């Protein structure tokens, strides 16, 4: 069994959106736009360091990549991992 607000609220929202908003919005739209201005999306035109972007090529090289490539034994003996919580 569905609760009453689960039926009534969507119906009221539909009635507002369909019938009341086209009548009310032209009057309150200018008032709302003063308080809540729309932000225009700005696209950057590559003003950053071009050489740095050419070198990186979109790949992130970290120290962890080197360890995986060389294997864990390249950095010395592996330390045992404890399953117990240490406070």
Curated annotation (Swiss-Prot):
Belongs to the UPF0729 family. This is UPF0729 protein C18orf32 homolog. It comes from Esox lucius (Northern pike). It holds the Pfam family DUF4512. It comes from the Eukaryota.
């Amino acid at each position: 069994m569905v609760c009453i607000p689960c039926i009534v609220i969507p119906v009221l929202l539909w009635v507002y959106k369909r019938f009341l908003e086209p009548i009310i919005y032209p009057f309150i739209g200018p008032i709302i736009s003063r308080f809540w201005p729309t932000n225009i999306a700005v696209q950057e035109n590559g003003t950053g360091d071009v050489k740095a972007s050419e070198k990186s090529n979109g790949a992130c090289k970290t120290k962890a990549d080197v360890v995986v490539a060389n294997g864990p034994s390249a950095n010395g003996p592996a330390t045992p991992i404890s399953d117990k919580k240490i406070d």
